[in-house]
């Protein structure tokens, strides 16, 4: 017998709800969030396993975001669950202080799993004083590798407000575990809800016939939300297709004279599908925007000198122009309006060194830094590079910060992703500030590709790439995902197609990582009109 065999393990889904939390604020309820830590026995340390979403003004929150942990029967797995009210991102226990804490509990995973229904209710305490209760639900995840996608609409829902209702719905799997909560649709009795996209095991634990309860509520700004009605079904029924309709019933109205239902719910899409691909997002209308940032520091040499990296001739474009053309030719077709922003950094602008300024100096309007199409980008570059006084140092912080603001507009209905192309001739002098911005940018719909021109060694750029070691900002926060790619121009200077390939090859996976992080799924494919 081989004593070093892989130890079987299961994945356990943990869901949390709390009741009667004490408030940290005198005039309002807390904005709670739960974080789950697992004790690392060898290091006697607590490692974060995951966290729920933050809920606004909730005394008794029921969190919809679950946390997944690996289960090892042969180990004592001690969990610490903390409920906090804090705005900043939390990774380590030391990242919050006593003032941020609402309450906490320590419990072994085995104790919860062996409780009836895999569920345990406990007291939350802070410094030994009761601060509420917590119910922890666990369930083994039977991974199917499949996802369920469905969409529904309501008709003639009950009026809960003076003129209408503000409906939303929750999905519970048997045992009363919340697995999904929709957005609120304001002022309507005939809502069309955004499509639902879930891992199949999240919805039903891998059991196609497990009972699901759809509960429809009317949102109220103040006070408890009102029940409109509910119905029960299972995944198998939802997927049968056709015009599947359900009556939603309010139990308090059953038996009253003339009562039939509180509305009709219709599923108009329902299907099983694998993980979405990059093309799924493109077909659903994803737009990829390009932003170009050009190094205007003095180390490039004056652009009218033949040794300058910005020196252009009719037969030999500069490495900057070649880089713009190589990357732009690939990305331009994915940009529907063909508007490409062009900025400079490290040059004099309005008499002062600027690390992010509009490259087009001829129009005199800071809001007109965009070019229409790739050729106009090159025209702006050729027409303005001789007019910009070069300065120093080389800093990326401002350019990336500007790109983050541009890229922060991607939503489920309006899917956009920005690729920032930075072309530079040397290392930066603001490495840590740039890393801080890249870590911040990892939460946005943004990728950063850096092309290094000239013969510099670019050691700092290899750090920014982050392939060997993930980026961590100055506060200890790790990057949410890999978004930066560095490529030296000289490795591909005679092969523009290869330069574009090497520069952009990670973009599809980076788009997918952002969509997964943001829980944005592909929209329905756009229809071709003859």
UniProtKB/Swiss-Prot annotation:
SMART domains: C2, VWA. Keywords: Calcium, Metal-binding, Repeat. The keyword Repeat applies. It comes from the Eukaryota. Its cofactor is Ca(2+). Residues 289-507 form the VWFA domain. Pfam families: C2 (PF00168), Copine (PF07002). Belongs to the copine family. This is Copine-D. The lineage of its organism: Eukaryota, Amoebozoa, Evosea, Eumycetozoa, Dictyostelia. The gene is cpnD.
